[in-house]
């Protein structure tokens, strides 16, 4: 039986419009893991593992808490606490793993499917800010936000301080294309009616195979360290452009 877990490879683009323009695009890859497949997804892969140290590994404490219960249970509890309804279908996460003992995820997405595994019912977005390393999760009810088949849109107010170069007075417009042969996530930040910032992740699906896993370790030998270095490099560029700095509220 073909696994639902896979690798997504593509590009991440950030575009700041105000108060001054800053734009960049980087190649990226993410793991897309079905939580029911965690026990065997890396079977036979020497450099990849779940629950034990390795070059690349999944470690429970890197993700949504409380971390003393299974991640799948924590996500179902989080959705139920927000909507009063418990998801019963598969849960698949889009994330970075731990590489060479280090993990940092600006955002991980948990896609909660219906019992028949035909559509996404909820998306949990777990965000980690920089440099404080605090976490916050938004729970998005997909059933009420279907724009058209396989497209989901959410608009909501910012509730978590993410970057010192943006204050809290924003609202978000997020657009998701349900994961398939391709995956797309588009996020826009508005202040009143002005578009300040947008980010887009566009990727293509690849099967988890020895060749693909070797390729990503060669092409991105320390993915999460690369993510952090990108964040701080772009922060330096914003500082040079005299973008206002906002203290943590």
Can you name each region flagged by the protein language model?
Residues 1-249:
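Mature, function-bearing regions of proteins
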